């Protein structure tokens, strides 16, 4: 005897023991009556368990030995007799036994078994006044119905077969029980326990809330429960026998179609034909966004609908649903799979092509109400053909496609997965072509806002690219848009890459959106600077006044501003405008956040970011192919600092003036190098520039030139050879200026020809540089062009004079200190002639202090202690001495 048979036997024994006092039929007549009752019970059970269809497991459950089957049959007969007297208890036991057998059959049967179990638990809990249990079981019941609606919404079953009658019956009865309990509670002498009272109120609120959701169905059920149950059974009778459908799958020519038509394990099919397109679309729209919705299955259904669509209206409707479905493939992935994105781009391009070819159909975000289950065609009203307006947003789909490509590139490591990154980057050209086609469509329909948003996307793709790539993009777009018209960029007019960007940017300047205007001018500035047009880029930046308002702009616009400014500084460096380059780049390199400010990495080590903030920071990062080379920018900045700051450091007289150097970053690097006892050969770009700066300070301009020219990062510039020539020439000139500032104090005059041979510059250039230094008061000298010399004017102390004056000052200070120390040691307070002498000496000391404190230079910086002060002090001292005698 099997385990289940033993359990049934024990149940039979217990039930027979409990029925010992009842009168039971016996003999042949009793046996016939037992069989008749058992048959009736089985028929009732088959009707009651309509939701627990278990035909698939009958052979498995009844394939055991003969004895077990006979035993279970006899148990059923005895229980059928007992049902005459103990209907509720025995039937619940039998249902639980059959549920134990059926619960593993299929997902559908398991869901309905859960519903039956929840309903049974609610009924028992209400009888036992266990409202806490009833509340939890009610939540389970509502979760069941939510899952049930998600799975049945895509089936061909009509609406009257969606909500089970048992569910509605439970809601109605439970609402009545709750109302009865609350009414009894008001007059009861003893109040209900707080937990139960809270549960009852919770059930009442839940029922009140859910009744609004099922208002129509509940109303129909309350009018005639039997009619509703009959309609439900009739609606669900069709898929009751799935075996013929399984056989139909193997028929020739239908196997492939059935693979798309079958949904779930219940054998329910969709009407994937031209006639059922709109109904299926509505069901998909209703199911979208709900929990446990199978997105892959939705995409498969929509793809099949696109294949069977016949009319233009059907294709547009299906494509408007299919493209967002692919873009919303998974909310847990950082970006959609590349294959899904490519397919979505192709389908969106197909949608744009259909709308271009069919001008009678227009997709807009705001349209009037219309029946989405009816085919629509253009109508003639008052002799004019009216367009068919379809609800949708083409510009949102286009921006989503563009953003998804950016996400894909952001999360692809260009170093470790370079080939994959390049493969994904190749799809930018087809996307650009689609953007151009969408722009022509929006221009034809005169959708100004959509045109501006499309043009700014088009600018974003080409503003930072070389001309050859832009020309390739434009040629592909022109071929795809053959026969189309565009007023912004006419396809029949040939223009270079800069002309295309100029036309697009000028169009955005006329837009009403300030954010788009700001970004367009930044794109334009960046492109002008990229081509080395420094003055045009600078003028655009100054005329835009963005530097005054950029702190109030959004983060994306600030990033674009930083990129544009860096490119302008690099353009100035490429043309040899060294002071301008240093001024432009100084603000960026005064911090240690260059890559963060350029949206190329996240470097906030000392700032704690929440996961949401960190995610936002990563989303703002630019793809690798749009990064600016920070090493190149740093090389340009430090080289500019070297050419500007080294002559300035040589011209200052005091340490205080040295601390007023413009670039503190460069000064710090130079001081660190000076403090090192030994500095090895340069290893990186920064080392090359620092060693070149030290060589330039020492007058070794040739060594400095070789170090700067040997920097490898210059090869990234388009005009690398020209830039190296400019730098070599600048180093020669600044080397001359540094030498004049450093050694002018040691010479009375210098030959111009000697300077020309030393610095390998023409005499005319030497004369020009010295003349400019004299004119700006940087150098106190004059030019004697007859003798070809520069004569230095001794308007300041020579080196020997300066050292002699320092020695005299220190000697006088030491003498005064020794005299004070001697007076303290001897305790001599000064009496008689010695006191007068000390007083005279003190007066003379004050005068000497004035002379020492007020010394000046030969430029006339002296105060009271000049030559006149010395004579005055000496005369006073001598006069007092004579008086004392």
UniProtKB/Swiss-Prot annotation:
Keywords: Cytoplasm, Initiation factor, Protein biosynthesis. Residues 1-81, 822-885 are annotated as: Disordered. The keyword Lipoprotein does not apply. It is found in: Cytoplasm. InterPro entries: EIF3C, EIF3C_N_dom, PCI_dom, WH-like_DNA-bd_sf, WH_DNA-bd_sf. Residues 624-797 form the PCI domain. The keyword Protein biosynthesis applies. Residues 55-76 have a biased composition (Acidic residues). It comes from the Eukaryota. PROSITE patterns: PCI (PS50250). One of its GO terms (biological process) is translational initiation. GO terms for cellular component: eukaryotic 43S preinitiation complex; eukaryotic 48S preinitiation complex; eukaryotic translation initiation factor 3 complex; eukaryotic translation initiation factor 3 complex, eIF3e; eukaryotic translation initiation factor 3 complex, eIF3m. Residues 9-28 have a biased composition (Low complexity). Residues 855-872 have a biased composition (Gly residues). Component of the eukaryotic translation initiation factor 3 (eIF-3) complex. Belongs to the eIF-3 subunit C family. HAMAP family: eIF3c. PANTHER family: EUKARYOTIC TRANSLATION INITATION FACTOR 3, SUBUNIT 8 EIF3S8 -RELATED, EUKARYOTIC TRANSLATION INITIATION FACTOR 3 SUBUNIT C-RELATED. Component of the eukaryotic translation initiation factor 3 (eIF-3) complex, which is involved in protein synthesis of a specialized repertoire of mRNAs and, together with other initiation factors, stimulates binding of mRNA and methionyl-tRNAi to the 40S ribosome. The eIF-3 complex specifically targets and initiates translation of a subset of mRNAs involved in cell proliferation. This is Eukaryotic translation initiation factor 3 subunit C. It comes from Cryptococcus neoformans var. neoformans serotype D (strain JEC21 / ATCC MYA-565) (Filobasidiella neoformans).
């Amino acid at each position: 005897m099997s385990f289940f048979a033993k359990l049934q036997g024990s149940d039979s024994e217990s039930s027979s023991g409990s029925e010992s006092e009842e009168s039971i039929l016996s003999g042949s007549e009793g046996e016939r009556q037992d069989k008749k009752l058992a048959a009736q019970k089985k028929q009732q059970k088959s009707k009651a368990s309509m939701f627990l269809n278990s035909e698939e497991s009958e052979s498995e459950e009844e394939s055991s030995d003969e004895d077990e089957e006979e035993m279970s049959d006899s148990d059923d007969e005895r229980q059928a007799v007992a049902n005459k007297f103990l209907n509720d208890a025995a039937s619940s036991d039998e249902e639980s036994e059959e549920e134990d057998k059926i619960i593993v059959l299929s997902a559908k049967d398991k869901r309905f078994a859960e519903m039956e179990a929840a309903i049974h638990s609610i009924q028992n809990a209400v009888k036992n006044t266990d409202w806490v249990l009833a509340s939890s079981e009610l939540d389970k019941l509502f979760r069941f119905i939510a899952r049930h609606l998600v799975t049945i919404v895509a089936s061909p079953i009509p609406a009257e077969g969606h909500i089970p009658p048992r569910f509605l019956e439970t809601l109605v009865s439970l609402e009545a029980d709750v109302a009865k309990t609350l009414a009894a509670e008001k007059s009861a002498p003893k109040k209900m326990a707080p937990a139960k009272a809270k549960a009852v109120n919770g059930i009442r609120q839940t029922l009140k809330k859910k009744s609004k959701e099922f208002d129509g169905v509940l109303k129909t059920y309350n009018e005639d429960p039997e009619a509703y149950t009959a309609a439900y059974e009739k609606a669900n009778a069709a898929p009751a026998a799935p075996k013929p459908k399984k056989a139909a799958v193997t028929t020739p020519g239908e196997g492939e179609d059935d693979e798309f038509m079958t949904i779930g394990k219940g054998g329910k099919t969709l009407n994937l034909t031209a006639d059922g397109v709109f109904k299926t679309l509505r069901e998909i729209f209703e199911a979208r966004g709900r929990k446990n919705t199978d997105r892959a299955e939705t995409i498969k259904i929509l793809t099949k609908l696109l294949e069977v669509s016949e009319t233009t209206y059907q294709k547009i409707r299906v494509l408007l649903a299919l493209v967002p479905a692919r873009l919303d493939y998974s909310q847990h992935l950082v970006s959609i799979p590349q294959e899904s994105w490519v397919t979505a781009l192709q389908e969106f391009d197909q949608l744009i092509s259909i709308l271009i070819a069919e001008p009678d159909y227009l997709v807009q975000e705001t349209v009037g109400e219309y029946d989405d289950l009816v085919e629509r065609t253009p109508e003639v009203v008052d002799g004019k053909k009216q367009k068919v307006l379809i609800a949708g947003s083409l510009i949102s789909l286009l921006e989503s496609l563009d953003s998804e490509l950016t996400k894909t590139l952001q999360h692809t490591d260009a170093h470790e997965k370079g080939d994959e990154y390049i493969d994904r980057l190749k799809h930018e050209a087809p996307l650009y072509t689609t953007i151009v086609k969408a722009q022509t469509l929006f221009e034809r329909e005169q959708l100004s806002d959509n045109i501006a948003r499309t043009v700014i996307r088009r600018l974003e793709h080409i503003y930072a690219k070389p001309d050859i790539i832009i020309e390739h993009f434009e040629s592909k777009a022109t071929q795809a848009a053959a026969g189309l018209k565009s007023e912004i960029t006419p396809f029949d007019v040939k223009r270079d890459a800069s002309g295309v960007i100029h036309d697009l940017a000028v169009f955005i300047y006329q837009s009403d959106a300030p954010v788009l205007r700001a970004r367009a001018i930044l794109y334009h500035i960046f492109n002008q600077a990229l081509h080395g047009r420094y003055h045009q880029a600078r003028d655009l930046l100054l005329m835009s006044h963005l530097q005054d308002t950029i702190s109030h702009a959004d983060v994306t616009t600030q990033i674009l501003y930083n990129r544009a400014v860096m490119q302008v500084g690099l353009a100035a460096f490429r043309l040899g405008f060294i002071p301008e380059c240093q001024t432009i780049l100084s603000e960026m390199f005064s911090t240690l956040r260059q890559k963060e400010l350029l949206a190329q990495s996240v470097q906030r080590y000392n700032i704690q970011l929440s996961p949401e903030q960190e995610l936002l920071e990563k989303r703002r990062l630019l793809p690798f192919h749009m990064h600016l080379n920070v090493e190149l920018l740093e090389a340009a900045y430090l080289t500019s600092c070297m050419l500007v700051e080294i002559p300035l450091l040589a011209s200052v007289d005091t340490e205080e003036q040295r601390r007023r150097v413009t670039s503190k970053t460069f000064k710090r690097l130079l001081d660190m190098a000076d403090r090192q006892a030994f500095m090895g050969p340069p290893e990186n770009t920064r080392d090359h520039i620092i060693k070149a700066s030290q060589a330039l300070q020492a007058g070794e301009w040739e060594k400095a030139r070789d170090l700067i020219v040997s920097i490898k990062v210059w090869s990234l510039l388009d005009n690398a050879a020209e830039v190296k020539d400019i730098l070599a020439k600048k180093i020669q000139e600044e080397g001359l200026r540094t030498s004049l500032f450093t050694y002018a104090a040691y010479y009375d005059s210098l030959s111009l020809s000697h300077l020309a041979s030393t610095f390998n510059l023409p005499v005319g250039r030497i004369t020009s540089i010295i003349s400019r230094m004299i004119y700006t008061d940087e150098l106190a000298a004059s030019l004697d062009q007859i003798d070809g010399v520069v004569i230095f004017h001794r308007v300041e102390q020579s080196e020997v004079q300066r050292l002699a004056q320092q020695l005299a000052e220190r000697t006088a200070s030491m003498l005064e200190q020794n005299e004070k120390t001697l007076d303290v040691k001897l305790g001599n307070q000064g009496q008689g002639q010695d006191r007068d002498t000390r007083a005279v000496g003190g007066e003379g000391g004050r005068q000497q202090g004035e002379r020492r404190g007020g010394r000046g230079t030969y430029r006339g910086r002296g105060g009271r202690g000049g030559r006149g002060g010395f004579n005055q002090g000496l005369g006073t001292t001598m006069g007092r001495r004579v008086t004392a005698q």
